[in-house]
C-alpha cells in the first residue's frame, strides 16, 4: 500500500516500489469513455539481474487503493532485457477519473509535471489559416 497520504507508487512485485519513473502516454476514444495509458519503463529495477520472480502485472497504488493491469511486456535488445511496457485500459468515465487521480498523485510524489500534446489542434489551425 502507499506509505503516506498523498503518495502513489507503481509496483511490478507486490510491496516493492519501482524507482524508475516511466514515460506515460494517454489515448482516449472520441467520446472520451474508453482509453488507454501506456507506460514505458527504460531499464527498470524490476528487470535488474538481482531481481528474482516473474512479473505478473503492474500495480498502481495510492491512498484510494490499487489498480492493476496484467498487460505487461518486456523489450529486449540483443537478448538483454531493456524496458518494460505496460498498458492500463479503462472502459468508463469513472475509471478514467480514478486513473487521473492516481496519475496526479504519482506525478506529485515524483516531482513530475503534466503536458498535453497539442499537435493535432495546431495542425488543424495551421490548415485553416492557409486556406
Curated annotation (Swiss-Prot):
InterPro entries assigned to the protein according to its UniProt record, in alphabetical order: Psb28_c1_sf, PSII_Psb28_class-1
GO cellular component, one term: plasma membrane-derived thylakoid membrane
Main location: membrane
GO-annotated biological processes: photosynthesis
Region (Disordered): 110-131
Entry keyword Membrane: yes
Gene3D superfamilies: Photosystem II Psb28
Compartments, record wording: Cellular thylakoid membrane
One of the Pfam families matching this protein, by short name: Psb28
Keyword annotations from UniProtKB, A to Z: Membrane, Photosynthesis, Photosystem II, Thylakoid
Residue ranges, compositional bias (Polar residues): 112-125
Family: Belongs to the Psb28 family.
Subunit structure: Part of the photosystem II complex.
UniProt name for this protein: Photosystem II reaction center Psb28 protein
Organism: Synechococcus sp. (strain CC9902)
